[in-house]
């Protein structure tokens, strides 16, 4: 048996062991979140409702929400959710299943790229880093497509890395790159093409290898890309031409939702943007706790011009490619409007950088002593953060007060609606009284950080980096479990499922459901009841543009129209925030239900 054959036979069982460990980790962290909490108002339930209406209308081209055209998003996420609904029925868990499987697919893609670039241990540590990072978990609690963009970018870079290893790039590698870019376009729009194209071009430019582009089967790859990406765009344009006050699909989707959004000129202006410094800082927070190892990981990537002038080995090529990948995303959004989660597609690249470094640190290479010194320093910094987190959480526990008997969490929050355009805006609502609801979760986070980072530092001091990494991974399992528990307690604030269930119990055909505010503020009513709702608000947000088409249902109510409806013979269920109870007509209002600081009022007792 040759040494190569022996290495392959040894690697295969190790690879299976790594993959089994990763799948088990995914099951423990991500599967419980399929079933709880309930879907949230805004993007979570709006996107689930758009998928439900695909099946309701048998229309896989034009998305709808509340019966109105919903043209601002690319369709792939909605297609996967609709397919899940068709197979498993319309359920919370079936709505979340595609995104959870997307996490697993991204973990496996990261493993494959890391293994190809730096060996199986690097692939394993990279996928471990991704699976246990804070940002990936938080932003897959909501049905948004950014994680899937990270998946397609990982596959794009995997195929491009194969291209770099081939003197004459194969059809499979070139077409795989084109297909991944096309799927990314169908997931998030034009950035699905801009990101991989920029990464490939900048890499070849820096390494003075632009001639490789001519060998990348550009014509056939473009055909593959267009075959996948173009049909939906063409059909959407044909099915949604300019009509009435609406300027059609192409203007809204490409001009308004891509170019004007990037330039902060999009209409309507119903969004906020994260400050630039916070945006970059949050990219590190989302990689926590593994961001502590990012500085030495980045230091190993080629970063001087003279480095690019020489032939790079496999790990150097990977380091440069991954650094460019992360930089393209962070720099791109530095010049546009941005949300906290726009950095998510960069996290696989950062996880791969960290995973490759962790693998080298744990191996007995000549560089290991220097790497382990850097690892001990990073672990010490992390332990310092762990102490700070522990002290802060213990301080919050001391400040927190046990909630009064019978009190709701909503009663103890301080509302900050000006922050709600940000995805994590409700965090600013917490008060010392409200923190009393989260004493257990705070204890888990504080003790978890202290014990986990302390063990990580202690074991690295004893030259046991593998044990140290395991301690950090287990720490994150506990912390993410605490996040899941906290979200279940916060769910009545973030969603309106209990109110939808209360309506369903007494609903009769002909009754009318009205949301006092924007559609997104109570969109779970639409999803959980399966009944179109009306909106006591001017045209705005997700339904703004679609409402201008002549065939759009008249769902927007005015004060005058709601007064007539309220005083008529029709039974009306009015969703309203406790802060904004409207002045209704002559008939009295009766409370049907309340939850999370929101009420369902009705004009009839029966």
Q: Which residues are covered by each model-predicted region?
A:
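Membrane-embedded architecture of ER/inner-membrane glycosylation machinery
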Residues: 2-7, 171, 175, 300-606
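Membrane-integral, polyisoprenol-dependent glycosyltransferases
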Residues: 2-370, 396-400
């Amino acid at each position: 048996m040759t040494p190569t054959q022996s290495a392959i036979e040894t690697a295969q069982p190790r690879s299976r062991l790594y993959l089994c460990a990763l799948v088990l980790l995914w099951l423990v962290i991500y599967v419980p979140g399929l079933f709880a909490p309930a879907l949230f108002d805004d993007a979570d339930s709006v996107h689930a409702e758009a998928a439900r209406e695909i099946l309701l209308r048998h229309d896989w081209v034009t998305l709808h929400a509340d019966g109105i055209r919903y043209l601002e998003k690319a369709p792939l996420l909605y297609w996967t959710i609709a397919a899940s609904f068709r197979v498993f029925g319309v359920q919370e868990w079936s709505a979340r299943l595609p995104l959870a499987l997307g996490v697993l697919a991204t973990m496996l893609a990261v493993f494959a790229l890391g293994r190809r670039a730096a060996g199986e241990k690097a692939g394993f540590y990279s996928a471990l880093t991704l699976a246990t990072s804070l940002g990936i978990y938080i932003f897959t609690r909501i049905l948004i497509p950014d994680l899937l963009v990270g998946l397609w970018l990982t596959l794009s870079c995997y195929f491009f890395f194969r291209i770099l290893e081939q003197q004459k790039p194969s059809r499979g590698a070139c077409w795989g790159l084109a297909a991944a870019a096309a799927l990314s376009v169908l997931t998030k729009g034009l950035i699905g093409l801009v990101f991989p194209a920029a990464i490939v071009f900048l890499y070849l430019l820096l390494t003075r290898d632009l001639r490789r582009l001519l060998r990348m089967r550009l014509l056939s790859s473009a055909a593959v890309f267009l075959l996948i990406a173009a049909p939906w765009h063409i059909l959407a344009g044909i099915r949604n031409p300019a009509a009435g006050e609406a300027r059609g699909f192409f203007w809204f989707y490409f001009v308004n939702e891509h170019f004007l959004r990037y330039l902060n000129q999009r209409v309507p202006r119903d969004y906020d943007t994260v400050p630039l410094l916070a945006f970059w800082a949050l990219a590190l927070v989302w990689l926590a706790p593994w961001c502590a190892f990012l500085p030495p990981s980045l230091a190993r990537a080629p970063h001087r011009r003279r480095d690019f002038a020489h032939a790079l080995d496999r790990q150097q090529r990977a380091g440069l490619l991954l650094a460019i990948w992360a930089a393209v995303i962070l720099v791109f959004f530095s010049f546009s409007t941005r949300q906290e989660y726009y950095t998510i597609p960069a996290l696989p690249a950062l996880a791969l950088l960290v995973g490759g470094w962790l693998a080298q640190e744990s191996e007995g290479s000549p560089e290991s002593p220097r790497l382990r010194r850097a690892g001990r320093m990073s672990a010490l910094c992390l332990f310092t953060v762990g102490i700070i987190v522990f002290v802060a959480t213990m301080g919050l526990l001391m400040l927190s007060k046990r909630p009064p008997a019978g009190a709701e969490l909503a009663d103890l929050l301080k509302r900050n609606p000006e922050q709600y355009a940000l995805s994590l805006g409700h965090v600013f609502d917490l008060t010392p009284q409200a923190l009393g609801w989260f004493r257990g979760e705070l204890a888990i986070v504080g003790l978890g950080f202290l014990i986990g980072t302390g063990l990580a530092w202690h074991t690295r001091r004893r030259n046991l980096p593998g044990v140290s990494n395991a301690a950090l991974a287990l720490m994150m399992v506990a912390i993410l479990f605490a996040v899941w528990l906290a979200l279940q307690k916060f769910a009545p604030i973030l969603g309106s499922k209990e109110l939808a269930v209360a309506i369903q119990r007494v609903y009769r055909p002909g009754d009318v459901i009205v949301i006092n505010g924007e559609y997104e503020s109570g969109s779970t009513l639409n999803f959980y009841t399966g009944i179109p709702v009306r909106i006591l608000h001017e045209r705005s947000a997700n339904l703004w543009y679609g409402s201008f088409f002549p065939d759009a249902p008249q769902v927007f109510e005015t004060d005058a129209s709601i007064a007539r409806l309220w005083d008529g013979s029709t039974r009306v269920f009015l969703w309203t925030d406790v802060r904004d109870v409207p002045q209704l007509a002559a008939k009295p209002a009766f409370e049907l239900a309340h939850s999370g600081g929101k009420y369902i009022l009705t004009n009839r007792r029966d």
